[in-house]
Structures are given as structure tokens and as C-alpha cells.
Regions:
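Loop-helix junctions at membrane interfaces
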Residues: 1-172
Length: 172
């Protein structure tokens, strides 16, 4: 019972830490996109949430950290969509990595799974912005979101190597 309680507390602490890192990385560099959103580096940490946390904790850490960044940055209209989109990205990263790492090495698996998660992000924001601004207009943000996705994959893959060297983030 004592070990199980310690693991639960440890998992919550790691999720909270990654959630804070997602928020900071998202707010650190903000480049405005054509339709009221902004490009950021948070996707790299969102992917780490999936790769190093369980699906539930990854979803919550990625979703809460990203949504909080949108709220603090003045993009409140994006908060609900961001919570879901970034949370689902972490779930895709978690389950996808579990499947892919059985068939290939760590870094290629992370890159492949990152591509799938980022495609979902681009599609998620396209649909959300389509309802807000019109689907033809929301196409304007697709290239910007794709660039953000590529940057997120590169950052996430690089940071995953650093995180693997520490024993702090053992797969939960």
C-alpha cells in the first residue's frame, strides 16, 4: 500500500511538473499566426507528456498546461479546444510509442509517433477554427500549425534523449 501511494504521488508530481513545462514552453516564444492563434514550442513538451507519462496523466498534463498558456496569453476562445487537442496528442504519443518502440529504435519511433500526433493537432485546429472563422479561412493556419508541429517533434525528440539519461521520468 505504501509503495502504491508513493507511485501515485510521484506520478502526480511528474504530471504537474510537465504541465508547468508545457505552459512555460508555450508562452516562452509566441509567434502570431494568421488567424488569432500563435506558434509556440509547447508541442515538444506535449509529446514528452505522452512518451514519459501514462495516458491519463499525459492527457491531463498536456491539456492543462497548454490550455493554461492559452488562457494566460489572452486566447480564451482556444482553451477548450486546446485542452482536448493537446491531451489527445499526448494519448497518441503514449500509445503510439508503446506500439512503435516494439518495431523500431527509440528515436525513429518517437519521430513517427510525433508526426501522427502533430497531424492530429493540425487537423484538430483546422476543424475548430473552421467552426469559428469558416473552413476556407482556417486553411490559412494549416501551414503555420504544420511548422509548429515539425518544431515540436524536433524539440521533443531532442529532450527525450536528455530525459532518458535521468531517472526522473521512468515510464509510468
Amino acid at each position: 500500500m505504501h509503495v502504491q501511494h508513493n507511485n501515485r504521488v510521484r506520478n502526480m508530481v511528474m504530471a504537474a511538473l510537465l504541465s508547468a513545462l508545457v505552459c512555460i514552453a508555450t508562452m516562452l516564444i509566441k509567434i502570431p499566426s494568421p488567424l488569432k492563434g500563435y506558434l509556440n514550442l509547447g508541442d515538444g513538451i506535449v509529446l514528452l507528456c505522452g512518451w514519459f507519462l501514462s495516458p491519463l496523466y499525459g492527457f491531463l498534463a498536456a491539456g492543462i498546461g497548454s490550455a493554461l498558456a492559452d488562457l494566460l496569453a489572452g486566447y480564451a476562445v482556444y482553451v477548450p479546444a486546446t485542452f482536448v487537442i493537446k491531451g489527445v496528442m499526448a494519448i497518441i504519443a503514449c500509445y503510439g510509442f508503446r506500439l512503435a518502440c516494439n518495431r523500431m529504435r527509440n528515436v525513429p519511433a518517437r519521430i513517427l509517433v510525433g508526426i501522427v500526433a502533430e497531424i492530429m493537432m493540425v487537423l484538430g485546429y483546422y476543424v475548430f477554427e473552421g467552426f469559428l472563422y469558416g473552413f476556407a479561412e482556417s486553411l490559412v493556419n494549416v501551414p503555420a500549425n504544420a511548422v509548429q508541429g515539425v518544431a515540436g517533434i524536433i524539440l521533443g525528440a531532442a529532450l527525450s534523449k536528455v530525459f532518458q539519461k535521468t531517472n526522473l521520468f521512468i515510464k509510468i
